[in-house]
Amino acid sequence: MTGKTIAHIRNFVLLALAQVIIFSQIHLFGYATACIFLIFLLKLPRHTTQNETMIWGFLFGIVTDIACNTPGIHSAAATAMAFTRKYILAAFTHKGLPDDFIPGVKSLKWGGYIVYAVLCIAIFYATLFPLELFAIRHFTTLLISTISSITLTMLFVVVTEFFSPNK
């Protein structure tokens, strides 16, 4: 195994444990839930294939689903986000960037990185909450949960980016 693969596995284990033990238990005001494992998917290098990204997304989702006793909704949402990530990232990159760059403030600048992250995270929550609520009569709850969870998760993304050594 290469050093990058070992680092990915280490990051996967640490984020999965943090998600399951801490963040899945926190529901601010009964609406907002942070899914910090999305940071891992956001920070995968651009050259990571779409299939690899989707496998990582599915693995994070299934670990969260098993720990939280949810029937596959995190898996579906994380896989949907992983599928669309490539296309969203392509909209914010230019030809001068190397193929193996890691999305972040250094490569995309603050504006590009924030929009990229918000769009990816919005796809995750726009898939997750309709599957969880499964009823249109809860539209207001769906909207509040989606917006508040995107905001809370973005807060963690920005804080992580501030403390990232690769800034």
What feature does the model see in each segment?
Residues M1-K167:
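Terminal, non-globular segments
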